[in-house]
Amino acid sequence: FLVVHLRMTGQFKLLEKDVLACTHTRVRFFEENGRELRFIDIRNFGQMWHVPYSKSVSEIVSGIKRLGPEPFSADFNSHYLKEYLKTKTRSIKSALLDQETVAGVGNIYADESLFDAGINPKIKSKHLNKTDLNKLCNSLTKILRISIGEGGTTFSDFRDLEGINGNYGGQAWV
């Protein structure tokens, strides 16, 4: 099977036959009926891995073993954060951006979540108490749910599969 990391600008487009490929088309998959699935990536940051059925994803995809829990998983909670961050001297914003702390959180959602939770992004991670971390977990999942519902955040060239901009940016506080 195929594992894909879109990174910041990667996207898939399903097109009818006879549509010319744009200059940022990186991979093309052809269907028997002539339609085509294209991986398009303006910045060329996206990655693809072929994972044979005889292997695990973590054997092939570099770095996947180091990823922290997903924000919507049961493993991501204030207890986990308290234990993970108890010795960390870096700022909480820096910790949120580290994919080993929590997977998939980028700059916009770290800022929004910290603002929503009322936490100064510069505070050292180890100084946050359980109440702060509970607020942060709740804020992060809340902000991500809202953003997903709005189609994400478009700040330059992000589009969904229909070519539509994400609308979360208009609601952002930061």
Enumerate the language-model features and the residues they cover:
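Structured catalytic/nucleic-acid-binding cores of DNA maintenance enzymes
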Residues: F1-V174
